[in-house]
């Protein structure tokens, strides 16, 4: 007589072990359909664009013809053009003016007050001229300290503070200047001062680390209260901001339509739903109208990378991640059948987006670029998988070994390389090869991103179960406390900014627009991770920034 299994026993025989998945329980998007439907007002936008073109001619004459014989006045106007976000309209004129000023620098560098000397130093240094910081020795007393009389010159102190941030390694004079100015500006900001708002914002985030478009938006309200402001320049800045904002709104609406069709938020609920924040990130890398194509493809690929990150970081099992990594490396739609159901929409979207990019690049005669985009995405998966191995094996690597993987996996290399895909003829194979090999400026940016990210998310990641972070690795290897580790990391971040500054000094290893992609990316990182992880945990900071960039036009 055969033995028949009971229903319960039969169920035990055929059921598979339940898969235990880690999830971070990310909060949903705070934006809903806020940006989904944008109605273009073509007539109004055309009228604004015509006014911009007219004002550009007026400002060009004011700054580069009428002020050409007064270098101090012209430098101030150039600084205002840059801070108001319209320097991209006058790049060649600014370069020519600064070259002329640099040629006479040795003749005039001993003259001028603190404001003008610091402004001249900052603008020349920022544009690659390796001018000496010895020019500031004149502001020291016989004891080698900065003169106490400088403290009451708040505009001069603020100018000196901004200049000190362009220091490179070994510039003790500027290190002392930064301590001196920061201390006294913080004290001044606590008191009633006409410059209080400007000082408070500068101490929180100096110009070097400020996202161009956000900085421009904030500076407009400061600039219009100055006694000697240029009405034409201010009007140009406001109109230009609104014209570009309209363009960004249209782009964001198009991206959201694509994102909604993918239905990622429902099909992959384990991943962060942050498409609006990601577009903000990319607009920080390049906001200019000429980079429409670049923003389009980079936003799509950073969305795909964010989902990939959350798969490798938490939701995917190790066995699934092995299959996914192999599939991405093979880059073949036939791999779909081997993937778990939830991974398939992600994988086909990755292939489709790269196909879309390749089609457009072929039309442009730049099809060679797709190789770099594809390879950098493959490499991103390999880096994520290396971290998954650490977690699977319960491994806490040595700090150097951790950084070799994690400094690149953080995503800066991928974003920097792919950002070149959407640029013009200034980009050749050389620039792709150069960035792919992670030169000093990119290594510095990667270090800043990785360490700031790990500091900002340390407690959250520990609570949910996560691969060892740089903080864990350093504490484990050197036997120091969490706070000691963070202090050491903050010093490394400071040194990495000096590396970035050095890379802008002439002769540069790559065209300045390429360096600017990395710098702008690092500025976004500083904004989002200085006070916690504002990208993952969207709060007032991110909401206010997105409203300023994409919702509220500047009042004219």
Swiss-Prot record:
The keyword Repeat does not apply. GO terms for molecular function: magnesium ion binding; pinene synthase activity. Mg(2+) 1 binds at residues 309, 313. It catalyses: (2E)-geranyl diphosphate = (1S,5S)-alpha-pinene + diphosphate. Mg(2+) 3 binds at residues 453, 461. Expressed in ripe fruits and roots. Not detected in vegetative tissues. Gene3D superfamilies: Farnesyl Diphosphate Synthase, Terpene synthase, N-terminal domain. It is found in: Cytoplasm, Cytosol. A motif (DDXXD motif) lies at residues 309-313. It comes from Fragaria vesca. Its cofactor is Mg(2+); Mn(2+). It comes from the Eukaryota. Pathway: Secondary metabolite biosynthesis; terpenoid biosynthesis. Its main location: cytoplasm. Keywords: Cytoplasm, Lyase, Magnesium, Manganese, Metal-binding. Binds 3 Mg(2+) or Mn(2+) ions per subunit. The Asp-Asp-Xaa-Xaa-Asp/Glu (DDXXD/E) motif is important for the catalytic activity, presumably through binding to Mg(2+). Belongs to the terpene synthase family. Tpsa subfamily. Monoterpene synthase catalyzing the production of (-)-alpha-pinene, beta-phellandrene and beta-myrcene as the major products. Unable to use farnesyl diphosphate as substrate. Exclusively expressed in the fruit of wild strawberries. Not detected in cultivated varieties. GO terms for cellular component: cytosol. Mg(2+) 2 binds at residues 309, 313. GO terms for biological process: diterpenoid biosynthetic process. This is (-)-alpha-pinene synthase.
